[in-house]
Amino acid sequence: MTAIQQFFKTFFLTELLKGLALTGRYTFKRKFTVQFPEEKTPISPRFRGLHALRRYENGEERCIACKLCEAVCPAMAITIESETRADNTRRTTRYDIDLTKCIFCGFCEESCPVDSIVETQILEYHGEKRGDLYFTKEMLLAVGDRYEKEIAAAKAADARYR
């Protein structure tokens, strides 16, 4: 580019006018912003949200205290304590998930041999203080009991890919 061409480009502000033209074109196009609480976008069927512990149909909890989920968790967000029952089966006495540490990777769900721990489609939960995001076994079982139909439907829909 010669010096004369550079002078005319600078003198007539062509770069500035190109930028203004681009801005003007996008000013009158439809916006892509979603007003979240009022408008909701579709959630992927494989979305990983709030955790839940499931039970069998007879009401017994599924977790066999194998501690695979605790071992595989990269964020070390899961804490499990167990004891042996009279019939020589292990069950959990403590199953805690710290959601402030959890990265929602889904490894706990993949490693569970009995599909006890699952990640639901729930994304709207909050805590006013740090302790509110520390889920105990009872809280996780309550989530599982409340949303069992949705969890079972999601598992059935995803069975082909597992």
UniProtKB/Swiss-Prot annotation:
Residues 54-83, 93-122 form the 4Fe-4S ferredoxin-type domain. It catalyses: a quinone + NADH + 5 H(+)(in) = a quinol + NAD(+) + 4 H(+)(out). One of its GO terms (cellular component) is plasma membrane. The keyword Lipid biosynthesis does not apply. Its EC number is 7.1.1.-. InterPro entries: 4Fe4S_Fe-S-bd (IPR017896), 4Fe4S_Fe_S_CS (IPR017900), NADH_quinone_OxRdtase_chainI (IPR010226). GO terms for biological process: aerobic respiration. Gene3D superfamilies: 3.30.70.3270. GO terms for molecular function: 4 iron, 4 sulfur cluster binding; iron ion binding; NADH:ubiquinone reductase (non-electrogenic) activity; quinone binding. It is found in: Cell inner membrane. [4Fe-4S] cluster 1 binds at residues 63, 66, 69, 112. Keywords: 4Fe-4S, Cell inner membrane, Cell membrane, Iron, Iron-sulfur, Membrane, Metal-binding, NAD, Quinone, Repeat, Translocase, Ubiquinone. Its cofactor is [4Fe-4S] cluster. Binds 2 [4Fe-4S] clusters per subunit. [4Fe-4S] cluster 2 binds at residues 73, 102, 105, 108. It is a peripheral membrane protein. Belongs to the complex I 23 kDa subunit family. NDH-1 shuttles electrons from NADH, via FMN and iron-sulfur (Fe-S) centers, to quinones in the respiratory chain. The immediate electron acceptor for the enzyme in this species is believed to be ubiquinone. Couples the redox reaction to proton translocation (for every two electrons transferred, four hydrogen ions are translocated across the cytoplasmic membrane), and thus conserves the redox energy in a proton gradient. NCBIfam families: NuoI, PRK05888.1-4, PRK05888.1-5. NDH-1 is composed of 14 different subunits. Subunits NuoA, H, J, K, L, M, N constitute the membrane sector of the complex. This is NADH-quinone oxidoreductase subunit I. It comes from Burkholderia thailandensis (strain ATCC 700388 / DSM 13276 / CCUG 48851 / CIP 106301 / E264).
